[in-house]
Amino acid sequence: MKRASIVREKKYYELVEQLKDRTQDVTFSATKALSLLMLFSRYLVNYTNVESVNDINEECAKHYFNYLMKNHKRLGINLTDIKRSMHLISGLLDVDVNHYLKDFSLSNVTLWMTQER
């Protein structure tokens, strides 16, 4: 393995552990919560310069949720998983994501118009 891959893998496991340590009681299965945290950690390692959980801000979370919406088919997740991920990450990081992704109703034109592009 190349050194960069080893460093990214190490950072990935550190982020997963930091996020798991902050996890409180969830209303869905712990296995699902862990898989959502692992997906978030993979995103952070591959697409951001975040070194620890303390570096994650609202802008990073918004970009992640947009990434989920654009790539949900490739990632094999559905809208329920995305909504769970939003609640989980918002709760873990004390990040408030007030934008159109919180509303999954059919009347949310902004959400569904961005998916058609």
Curated annotation (Swiss-Prot):
Q: Where in the cell is it found?
A: Cytoplasm
Keywords attached to this entry:
Cytoplasm
Record InterPro entries: SwrA
**Short name of any one Pfam family annotated for the protein:** SwrA
GO cellular component annotations, sorted alphabetically?
Answer: cytoplasm
Query: Could you say what the effect of mutating residue 69 to A is?
Result: In strain: 3610
Biological process according to GO: positive regulation of single-species biofilm formation
Miscellaneous notes: This protein is functional in undomesticated strains of B.subtilis but not in laboratory strains, such as 168, because of a frameshift mutation. Therefore laboratory strains of B.subtilis are unable to swarm.
State its role.
Answer: Required for swarm cell differentiation. Plays a crucial role in regulating the degree of cell flagellation.
Any idea what this protein is called?
Answer: Swarming motility protein SwrAA
- Give the encoding gene's name: swrAA
